[in-house]
From Swiss-Prot:
GO molecular function: DNA binding; zinc ion binding
Source organism per UniProt: Aliivibrio salmonicida (strain LFI1238) (Vibrio salmonicida (strain LFI1238))
Protein function: May play a role in DNA repair. It seems to be involved in an RecBC-independent recombinational process of DNA repair. It may act with RecF and RecO.
UniProt domain Toprim: residue ranges: 81-176
Protein family (similarity comment): Belongs to the RecR family.
UniProt keyword annotations, A-Z: DNA damage, DNA recombination, DNA repair, Metal-binding, Zinc, Zinc-finger
Protein name, as recorded: Recombination protein RecR
Pfam families, per the entry: RecR_C (PF21175), RecR_HhH (PF21176), RecR_ZnF (PF02132), Toprim_4 (PF13662)
Amino acid sequence: MRTSGLLEQLMESLRCLPGVGPKSAQRMAFHLLQRNRQGGMQLADALSRAMSEIGHCSECRTFTEEDTCAICLNPKRQMNGELCIVESPADIVAVEATGQFSGRYFVLMGHLSPLDGIGPSDIGLDLLDHRLGRGDIKEVILATNPTVEGEATAHYIAEICQEHHVSASRIAHGVPMGGELELVDGTTLSHSILGRQKLY
């Protein structure tokens, strides 16, 4: 079936979303046009406004409509000397959902990857260096992903912390709650053994 230019453009635009291939994009486009034109208009409006009005927090670099996000403006969090380093704004949502952290964040928007040409300044480590130099951070919690790049990034940041005499800790990685050891991969199990906690 030959499709119109506008329909092709719509399907091609939908393919910019992660995990959306040609078939999924076609299904979405046809659904919006056949069954939910009102929803399509709302989606277009929300996307347009979000793209033009949402920027980055001047303190932590997460997404916000204001110059500074609500977490960074919270006086209680400002008094807490902990700074959690994450790779993306989605990681903040995950950490906040635990209810176990009451400090502030710094979002890298990625990780170090020399092979891809991503260096320290590309993920804001120059800004982090400046922020640690202000003296209001007592501990940095490194919550980068448990990947080779995430580990390398964490070690690099730990060196910056050392220069500023700021304590640096790494979140624990290991066997998930309810998991069975025989189903856990070797690398994860190795991290669990190395990061074990003393009970007595």
